[in-house]
């Protein structure tokens, strides 16, 4: 079985549905299936707006940058998934993804965002991407996805619109090369 947990999946150019030009961070991969978060499709909702909509009691002043909530995938779009650097905080529903990263689905992590208690780095997603047992492996064999080790700079710091090209460049591929490969093929 391929080891995909903690890696990026890069959509091949022929995927023309929801996953066109996406990068997915794989949060879980085992015999039962796979789950990940699209990291380069921002919604129109900023994390600050999400925080105010959830109406948390603001005990401290909150500082938010320009981070947007991303559309993590077409499944469970009403549910929040926070991928973050590991922290000493004991959040209720946290799943350790790698030695350095965890995913939390409970509101207690959201309550810390913008405060000194927040994880050092985090990505907030609505929805997730999931595959049944063996489904993702088949898609990889069918050349729907490229697999590459993840990178914190791409995951947390890079502008959303640059993440697809940067993930491809981890493999030495420039997305422009994909466009050239399509010329003359119908």
UniProtKB/Swiss-Prot annotation:
Descriptive protein name: UPF0301 protein HI_0304
Organism in which the protein naturally occurs: Haemophilus influenzae (strain ATCC 51907 / DSM 11121 / KW20 / Rd)
Disulfide bonds: none
GO cellular component labels: cytosol
InterPro entries named among the record's database cross-references: AlgH-like (IPR003774)
Pfam families: DUF179 (PF02622)
Family that this chain belongs to: Belongs to the UPF0301 (AlgH) family.
Domain of life: Bacteria
């Amino acid at each position: 079985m391929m080891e995909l947990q903690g890696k990026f999946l890069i959509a091949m150019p022929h995927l023309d549905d929801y996953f066109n030009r996406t990068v997915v961070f794989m949060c879980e991969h085992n015999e039962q299936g796979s789950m990940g978060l699209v990291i380069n499709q921002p919604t129109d909702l900023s994390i600050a707006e999400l925080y105010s909509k959830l109406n948390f009691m603001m005990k401290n002043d909150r500082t938010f940058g320009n981070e947007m909530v991303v559309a993590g995938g077409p499944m469970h779009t009403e549910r929040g998934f926070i991928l973050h650097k590991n922290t000493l905080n004991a959040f209720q529903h946290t799943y350790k993804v790698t030695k350095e990263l965890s995913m939390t689905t409970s509101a207690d992590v959201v309550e810390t965002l913008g405060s000194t208690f927040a994880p050092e780095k985090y990505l907030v997603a609505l929805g997730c991407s999931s595959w049944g047992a063996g489904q993702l492996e088949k898609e990889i064999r069918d050349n729907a996805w490229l697999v590459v080790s993840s990178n914190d700079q791409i995951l947390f710091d890079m502008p959303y619109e640059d993440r697809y090209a940067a993930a491809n460049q981890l493999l030495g591929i420039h997305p422009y090369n994909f466009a050239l490969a399509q010329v003359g093929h119908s």
